[in-house]
Amino acid sequence: KRVKEAKPEACIDGVHLQSQIAQGQEVIVGMVRDPQFGALMMFGSGGVEVEGLKDVAFALAPLTQAEAEKMIRKTWAGRKLKGFRNIPAADEESVIDVLIKLSWLAFENESIEEIEINPLRVLSTGAVAVDVRMRLKGEKP
C-alpha cells in the first residue's frame, strides 16, 4: 500500500523474504584450482577482516577430518572459534563439515575453478553461508 502511494508507477512482481541470521563469527571458506596441484582449499578470517588480516590457511583437496582441523588451528579465526574474551565459542564441527564437503565437491568436479563462501557465519550451533561465489572453467574471473 505504501509503495503504491509513494511510487504509483512501480511494478512489483513479488517479494523475497529471508530470515535474519543470528550473530556469529564470520570466516571465509573457499577453493581455487591450481593447474599443477588441483583443488586448493582455503580457510581464514572472513567478512571485512579477510583483506586486512591475511589470516588464511591452505591445503590440498580432498580434506580429511584431521587436515580440516589442522587448517583451522593454523589461523586466528580458528582460535577465535573456541571463544575469546567477549566473543562466544562457535560450532567448529560445522566448519570442519563444510570444509570437507566443499573439498570433495571441488575434487570430484574439475569444472569448478573457484568457490568462495564469505562470510560463512558460524553460530553456536551450525553455520550459514551468507554469500557464495563460484566460477566455472571457461568463465572470466
Stretches with model-predicted labels:
Residues K1-P141:
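ATP-dependent carboxylate/acyl-activation modules
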